[in-house]
């Protein structure tokens, strides 16, 4: 059967629901408030509405199997029967799935890390020597049948075998998972046959790993694998999707295989990639010309120019997003506070689908058919270029002056001596990363302030009570360096964005970070200006309640960029320095208020690292420079902390050392302290706090378990440089879990401290 050609599609779509319905349903299930039937009903409704909306908008190929209760890599591990043995002990299939993702009282969760250079986190499959791959196609077949029954032109989407293995982790003495690629090819061939038998005309196999340098043999592997899969006698047409950058030599390799379509990211990859591969002349090129991971409106005229150049290089050209719209909010419609100019510059998920359809129509019927849409796009482009909010001469001049004079602090040993004399901390000092649980009282107060039920003064009174409670709790637990708990902050980036010029904070711009965790990235559209202190009053109040040091808590410039939708009209380095200047001014004001410890978090340092090694040094140069610009305005006696989240730390370990923070805390529990060896390898000599327990899991670690982690850390870090802290902030945990875990952490620190 000849597959029906398609002209307009998207790589994938969000699954959390336009009002975060899936978040509420899964959290209700985890808490035991609702049952499986209720959860599955919500999921089915979300799938139905998503598919219907995409088809109604004009897509003639709709991705399915992009829904997930937690994560698509975990879904693929289930499909390949590759869950670890410890999770298999759970008899119920859904509870087994969630145990692998989140852990429970008996099962440690799988590791979690960033999905390429995005802020989405995926669950890392473990491939052991005992892992026996086998096909479990129930989910993908079920969703295909659902969609076809609904009359949807459905295209199942599955993570491809190369990407699955390159993003998995070998355990228990296993070699690199990619060494087992040959075992997966017949399983994928079996899947293709089942999909064809159940009515799929097309299948999309996602291979974003091909745009990275993760495997030098990737181009050859891609050609070999897709030659075999493309030669299968019973299969749908195959569309191999690459995204997040340039597939390089893999593009030509794929073009030499029998697959029918290849997706290319023409937003984050070069426009010339397709023209350089003559073998594409017989293929459908799925052209990712609409940015799937940022919120700026597409310049339709420029995108059409790109598409037109492709027409002579491919048998067919289909229009698509550059990647899944999982990474952007659902729609601009709820954003009623947007001014007309800013609104005209933006496109969220629904608007991006409309852009794809418009561009496909222009290719089919000519530019005249979409003349009004092109005119509106041109007007938005012109409006954005001329808006005065995009340029502040004073900020730019200050940055130039500071950078020219150098952004360096004093000698680390001298700083440590000065800080020791000021702080008088014991060996293995205990602390937490920053946030404490956002209680129902906090959320109610925030909602009451928004609705006008309470005024700002009453809101501040309630937040100060929360701060006082957190300070009291920490003193009772015996922590050494305290935090104020951040009750006043809705989000560690949005809180600052709401107080800085150049940002717009959305009302409903939610995107998935991991599992049920959703974030609302602000939009950074203009030059960044700090007009007033943002945290000093809250931190000073917390410090007034205790004789122990309270950390000032700030978010670093790279993380603010990584977790925002950032302007694309100037280099990221320039924008990072503008944010860094605002943070620098805040650190100076905190120091003037008597705060002796200031934490500038950079959990997303690894996130923005370019996927190709050739581009990485330049990024790390300006990322480190921005952090130093933010932190070099304080005295040697002020202790600067930073915190970094799950990532492949080894790739940026030199940059972590170059940040030159006095204390660096890192997520390390799930990866079993592996990062400490990496730090030692680059001669890291400042203090470090490797996370001693995993806060992403609801399980409470025992004192013995934490003590064991501390002793493991002491084998790599001397006691005088080792701090004791959880993996990350505690915002998403419940208060009982936090108290029990921290009690055990402090007890473990005392136990180990006695022996050093």
Curated annotation (Swiss-Prot):
Binding-site residues for Zn(2+), renumbered to this chain: 643, 645, 667, 728
Cofactor note: Binds 1 zinc ion per subunit.
Functional pathway: Amino-acid biosynthesis; L-methionine biosynthesis via de novo pathway; L-methionine from L-homocysteine (MetE route): step 1/1
Binding site for L-methionine: 433-435, 486, 601
Entry-linked CDD domains: CIMS_C_terminal_like (cd03311), CIMS_N_terminal_like (cd03312)
Co-factor requirement: Zn(2+)
Pfam families: Meth_synt_1, Meth_synt_2
Enzyme class at the top of the EC tree: transferase
Gene3D superfamilies in alphabetical order: 3.20.20.210
Binding site for L-homocysteine: 433-435, 486, 601
InterPro entries reported in the protein's UniProt record: Cbl-indep_Met_Synth_N, Cobalamin-indep_Met_synthase, Met_Synth_C/arc, UROD/MetE-like_sf
Residues where 5-methyltetrahydropteroyltri-L-glutamate binds: 20-23, 114, 517-518, 563, 607
Family named by the database record: Belongs to the vitamin-B12 independent methionine synthase family.
Protein's name according to its UniProt entry: 5-methyltetrahydropteroyltriglutamate--homocysteine methyltransferase
Organism of this sequence: Mycolicibacterium paratuberculosis (strain ATCC BAA-968 / K-10)
């Amino acid at each position: 059967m000849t597959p029906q050609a398609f002209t307009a599609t998207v790589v994938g779509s969000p699954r959390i629901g336009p009002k975060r319905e899936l978040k509420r349903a899964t959290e209700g299930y985890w808490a035991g408030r609702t049952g499986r039937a209720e959860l599955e009903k919500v999921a089915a409704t979300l799938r139905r509405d998503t598919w219907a909306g995409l088809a109604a908008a004009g897509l003639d190929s709709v991705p399915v199997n992009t829904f997930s209760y937690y994560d698509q890599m975990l879904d693929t591990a289930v499909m390949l029967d590759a869950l670890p043995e410890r999770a298999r002990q759970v008899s119920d299939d859904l509870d087994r799935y969630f145990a692998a993702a989140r852990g429970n009282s008996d099962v440690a969760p799988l590791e979690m890390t960033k999905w390429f250079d995005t802020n989405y986190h995926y669950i890392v499959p473990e491939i052991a020597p005992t892992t026996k791959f086998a096909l479990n196609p129930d989910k993908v077949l079920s969703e295909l049948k659902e969609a076809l029954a609904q009359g949807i032109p459905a295209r199942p989407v599955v993570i491809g075998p190369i990407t699955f293995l390159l993003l998995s982790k070998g355990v228990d003495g296993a070699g690199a998972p990619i060494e087992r690629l040959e075992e997966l090819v017949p399983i994928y061939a079996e899947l293709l046959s089942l999909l064809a038998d159940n009515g799929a005309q097309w299948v999309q196999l996602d291979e974003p790993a091909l745009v990275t340098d993760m495997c030098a043999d990737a181009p050859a592997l891609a050609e070999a694998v897709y030659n075999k899969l493309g030669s299968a006698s019973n299969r749908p047409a195959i569309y191999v999707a690459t995204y997040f950058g340039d597939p390089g030599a893999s593009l030509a390799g794929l073009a030499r295989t029998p697959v029918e379509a290849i997706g290319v990211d023409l937003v984050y990859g070069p426009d010339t990639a397709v023209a350089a591969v003559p073998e594409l002349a017989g293929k459908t090129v799925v052209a990712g010309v609409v940015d799937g991971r940022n919120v700026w409106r597409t310049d339709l005229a420029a995108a059409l120019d790109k598409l037109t150049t492709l027409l002579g290089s491919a048998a067919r050209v289909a229009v698509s997003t550059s990647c899944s719209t999982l990474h952007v909010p659902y729609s601009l419609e709820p954003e009623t506070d947007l001014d007309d100019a800013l609104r005209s510059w933006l496109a969220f998920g629904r608007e991006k689908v409309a852009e794809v359809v418009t561009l496909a129509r222009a290719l089919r019927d000519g530019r005249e058919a979409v003349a009004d849409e092109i005119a509106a796009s041109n007007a938005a482009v012109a409006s954005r270029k001329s808006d005065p909010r995009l340029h502040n001469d004073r900020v730019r001049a200050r940055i130039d002056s500071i950078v020219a004079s150098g952004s360096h602090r004093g000698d680390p040993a001298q700083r440590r001596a000065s800080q020791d004399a000021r702080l008088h901390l014991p060996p293995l000092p205990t602390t937490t990363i920053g946030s404490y649980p956002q209680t129902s009282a906090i959320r109610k107060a925030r909602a009451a302030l928004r609705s006008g039920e309470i005024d700002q003064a009453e809101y501040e009174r309630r937040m100060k009570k929360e701060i006082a409670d957190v300070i009291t709790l920490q003193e009772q637990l015996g922590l050494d360096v305290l935090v104020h708990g951040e009750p006043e902050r809705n989000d560690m980036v949005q809180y600052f964005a709401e107080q800085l010029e150049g940002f717009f904070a959305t009302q409903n711009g939610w995107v998935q970070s991991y599992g049920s965790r959703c974030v609302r990235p602000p939009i950074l559209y203009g030059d960044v200006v700090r007009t007033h202190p943002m945290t000093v009053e809250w931190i000073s109040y917390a410090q007034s309640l205790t004789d122990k040091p309270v950390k000032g808590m700030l978010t670093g410039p790279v993380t603010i960029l990584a977790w925002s939708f950032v302007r694309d009209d100037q280099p990221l380095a320039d924008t990072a320095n503008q944010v860094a200047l605002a943070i620098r001014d805040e650190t100076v004001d905190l120091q003037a208020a008597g705060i002796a410890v200031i934490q500038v978090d950079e959990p997303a340092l690894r996130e923005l690292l370019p996927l190709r090694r050739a581009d990485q040094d330049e990024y790390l140069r300006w990322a480190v420079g921005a952090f130093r610009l933010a932190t070099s305005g304080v005295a040697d006696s002020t202790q600067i902390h930073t915190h970094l989240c799950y990532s492949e730390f080894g790739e940026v370990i030199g940059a972590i050392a170059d940040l030159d923070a006095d204390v660096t805390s890192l997520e390390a529990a799930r990866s079993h302290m592996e990062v400490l060896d990496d730090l030692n390898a680059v001669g890291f000599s400042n203090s470090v706090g490797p996370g001693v327990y995993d806060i992403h899991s609801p399980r409470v670690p025992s004192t013995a378990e934490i003590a064991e982690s501390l002793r493991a850390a002491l084998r790599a870090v001397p006691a005088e440089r080792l701090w004791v802290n959880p993996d990350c902030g505690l915002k998403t945990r419940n208060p009982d879990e936090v108290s029990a875990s921290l009690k055990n952490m402090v007890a473990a620190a005392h136990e180990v401290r006695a022996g050093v």
